[in-house]
A protein has these predicted regions:
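Short gly/pro-enriched beta-turn/loop segments at secondary-structure junctions
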Residues: 145-146, 176-179, 202-206, 210-213
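An anion-binding catalytic pocket shared by soluble metabolic enzymes
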Residues: 49, 56-151, 158-169, 174
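Short, intrinsically disordered, mixed-charge
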Residues: 142-145, 166, 201-204, 232-235
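Divalent metal-coordination and catalytic microenvironments
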Residues: 81, 140, 154, 199, ...
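A general structural signal for well-ordered alpha-helical packing
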Residues: 137, 196-200, 223, 227-230
């Protein structure tokens, strides 16, 4: 990298969502020997609008499903849901496992990062939202009002394919579900507000994006639509990583077949994703543990 390019690169990294010198204070500092009982939350049902409550239930359900299908990463990563008709969205408290998440545990923030509501935690658990989560999710919700859900994962397969130079290959029918796959180059931990503009520009009108050397991003007009994209992208990445690890030459369909399949999978050709699948996913979550609705 030339000195001029280096100066330009350094100059643009100037305004983090949390100043780097204060980054430690942005995360809860916990006593490691403390006994932490199971988390319980006072229900917000009837205390928020019906639209917000539905968004909370669906978002919490998505967390449980991401955990169920093995796409989570301990307490990290994030799923957000926009509150319909508002410039506000829901984020997870950093420190909770995905299978602990419930409708009344989600933090409500506005597009500027102001906390509008947060749950009460036992003494010693000052869980807040992840600054990197705010940067990534506010970028999409600010620029794309039609997007109501954003899902970011660090799945093993997603990170692997995001690090392949060729990215996601059109090698399976599942991969061909995505006519457009966006890519965003890695810039370090996503705490710089300036990265939001570049992230949204790279996303364009795609439903999914591979964050180079990082993970995956899926967006949708509903939680069900975003989850469907996240799940399908994960399946496509797993298949590709497994196939490439075998060392065999990968057979790709012809360009004609790729375009034909892309067309068949367009929402305008058939239906928006999530309409058929999401009720079934909700029923699955209910069978596993309906406490996400609390």
């Amino acid at each position: 990298m030339t000195s001029a390019r280096l100066r330009k690169s350094v100059a643009r990294v100037t305004r983090p969502a949390v100043p780097l010198k204060d980054i430690k204070g942005a995360y809860p500092q916990l006593a490691p020997d403390k006994d932490y009982p199971p988390l319980k939350f006072k229900s917000l049902k009837g205390k928020v609008s019906a639209a917000e409550w539905q968004a909370r239930v669906d978002c919490a359900c998505a967390y449980r499903l991401v955990r169920h299908f093995g796409m989570d990463d301990l307490v990290y990563n994030h799923i957000s849901a926009r509150i319909p008709g508002k410039e506000e969205f829901l984020l997870n408290p950093l420190g909770m496992m995905y299978d602990e998440m419930c409708a009344s545990s989600l933090i409500k923030v506005d597009l500027d990062g102001n906390v509008l509501w947060e749950p009460e935690f036992p003494k010693g658990l000052g869980y807040k939202f992840n600054p990197a989560g705010y940067v990534i999710h506010s970028a999409v919700h600010r620029a794309k009002p039609a997007i109501h859900c954003v899902i970011h994962t660090h799945s093993i397969a997603g990170m692997a394919v995001a690090s392949f130079k060729r990215g996601l290959l059109p090698m399976t029918q599942t991969a061909l579900r995505f006519e457009k796959v966006a890519y965003h180059d890695y810039e370090g931990v996503a705490i710089e507000l300036e990265e939001r503009e570049r992230l949204v520009a790279d996303l364009g009108d795609a439903d999914v994006m591979l964050l180079r050397n990082h993970g995956t991003l899926a967006v949708g007009a509903s939680v069900g639509e975003a989850f469907n994209s996240a799940y399908r992208l994960e399946r496509a990445c797993r298949t590709q990583a497994l196939a490439m690890s075998a060392g065999e030459e990968i057979l790709l369909p012809s360009r004609e077949v790729i375009e034909k399949t892309n067309y068949a999978y367009r929402a305008t050709t058939r239906r928006s994703y999530g309409i058929l699948e999401w009720p079934a996913m909700r029923r699955l979550a209910d069978r596993i543990d309906p406490s996400y609705k609390q």
